[in-house]
Regions:
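Surface beta-strand/loop "capping" patches
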Residues: 3-38
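Terminal connector regions
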Residues: 1-14, 62-66, 80-101
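Short beta-strand and strand-turn-strand segments in soluble, beta-rich domains
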Residues: 52-69
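Asparagine-centered strand-capping/turn motif at beta-strand->loop junctions
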Residues: 35-42, 87
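Beta-strand-rich interaction surfaces with strong enrichment in secreted/lumenal proteins
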Residues: 23-24, 67-73
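Short, hydrophobic/aromatic beta-strand segments
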Residues: 43-51
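Beta-strand secondary-structure signal
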Residues: 32-36, 49, 80-82, 94
Length: 101
């Protein structure tokens, strides 16, 4: 018989607060984004997912090349993450996470 991992306790992770700032840079037909993240809470910030969407349509900007994503941050930990993508339309950052407030 197969045995599967039980990840149900992840649903019990306490909520935590994530601080973030970011900026976009246009370079001819390419855009770059730099995102500064900081876990301001007392618990791990689990599986932080960064997305860039077109501001007008709300559609995901693809392809996008992140140097890292689905990040975990311990309490007080900070991280800078960069990405680049083609296009000149106005974009915005969306930040999601397993246990973010």
């Amino acid at each position: 018989s197969k045995v599967y991992a039980d990840f149900t306790q992840l649903n019990e992770l306490p909520k935590t607060q994530l601080g973030q700032s970011h900026y976009f840079e246009q370079d001819s037909e390419q855009q770059n984004i730099k995102v500064a993240l900081k876990n301001n809470g007392d618990h791990i910030a689990f599986l932080i997912n960064l997305k860039v969407v077109d501001k007008k349509t709300g559609e995901l900007v693809l392809p996008i090349f992140w140097e890292d994503n689905f990040i975990n941050l311990l309490p007080g930990e900070e991280r800078m993450v960069c990405a680049n993508f083609k296009g000149t339309s106005e974009a915005e950052l969306k930040v999601e996470g397993w246990n973010l407030e």
